[in-house]
Amino acid sequence: MKLTKTALCTALFATFTFSANAQTYPDLPVGIKGGTGALIGDTVYVGLGSGGDKFYTLDLKDPSAQWKEIATFPGGERNQPVAAAVDGKLYVFGGLQKNEKGELQLVNDAYRYNPSDNTWMKLPTRSPRGLVGSSGASHGDKVYILGGSNLSIFNGFFQDTVAAGEDKAKKDEIAAAYFDQRPEDYFFTTELLSYEPSTNKWRNEGRIPFSGRAGAAFTIQGNDLVVVNGEIKPGLRTAETHQGKFTAKGVQWKNLPDLPAPKGKSQDGLAGALSGYSNGHYLVTGGANFPGSIKQFKEGKLHAHKGLSKAWHNEVYTLNNGKWRIVGELPMNIGYGFSVSYNNKVLLIGGETDGGKALTSVKAISYDGKKLTIE
């Protein structure tokens, strides 16, 4: 539905507009949350997650284009895989899927899709770390991957849960032990990884100077890398943000200010936020958290989200001169979708909203330094 509404948000010092005249994009054929995607030229690829083993493409330069299904992904259904494009091909890594015993397990396989002949190929490699909750982006001839859950710990939790069968007391005991740990004891990935398709090799690009993350917003533009929030342990996010730069001596990192709290609310960090660049401005929006979890953690409760409800968000943040501010709100809460920068807009594709409902919508947001436009 197209909406026309302009509001001057004096509290946010910005104008934001719901545009009725700009290009709109067709909805996805199915709701896709916890999936992945990449942009190759003018064509966006989105799939997996709640979309099963399907991938879909949309030609963004064609105003009349519709989503098209491509060859079925051969690695089976999976949630939270990582994808990126290098040299005109799509690469998909890892994710979370059920094994033959019905146990949810992290997988570390890798696949390549070639648009020229609509074929997939399983690659003769495995990621050196677990790739659930990881975030990926391409730079030059490599895919860079940040963060992710520990394969052994994550898989062990699900194996123990399935082994407990219908014994609720045992399952509760397993869950309590799993969540009642310090962030560092989950051993989230703390190296920046890279994969180079031309050599089929993984590389440790150096330890990140901040805690391991799952579900962080991660973007590469030019030589700059930006990391926003993410989980530091299951159920607990951080409001921290960081910036890296590719140099001759490797990636050099610095801390940015924490993401600010919306007026009248706490800032409990975000996981599953969407991000990208518009007219040179870095935008972050959506994501989910457990309001009150940071407070409980600071009070000494390691199971920081115990008794709290998950909340999805709609604030739009921008980074300008090293400072964050809120410049508007989306018409709906959103998280765990796919975002991509295209034609000075950030496209928000699929995802989930309140209660975890999968979305089919495709929204576009843009910001010129004064006005946020939502299409």
UniProtKB/Swiss-Prot annotation:
The active site is at 231 (proton acceptor). Converts alpha-N-acetylneuranimic acid (Neu5Ac) to the beta-anomer, accelerating the equilibrium between the alpha- and beta-anomers. Probably facilitates sialidase-negative bacteria to compete successfully for limited amounts of extracellular Neu5Ac, which is likely taken up in the beta-anomer. In addition, the rapid removal of sialic acid from solution might be advantageous to the bacterium to damp down host responses. One of its GO terms (molecular function) is racemase and epimerase activity, acting on carbohydrates and derivatives. Keywords: Carbohydrate metabolism, Isomerase, Kelch repeat, Periplasm, Repeat, Signal. The keyword Transmembrane helix does not apply. Its EC number is 5.1.3.24. It is found in: Periplasm. This is N-acetylneuraminate epimerase. The keyword ATP-binding does not apply. The gene is nanM. Pfam families: NANM. Its main location: periplasm. Residues 1-22 form the signal peptide. Homodimer. NCBIfam families: muta_rot_YjhT, PRK14131.1. It catalyses: N-acetyl-alpha-neuraminate = N-acetyl-beta-neuraminate. Belongs to the NanM family. HAMAP family: NanM (MF_01195). InterPro entries: Kelch-typ_b-propeller (IPR015915), NANM (IPR056734), NanM_proteobact (IPR019936).
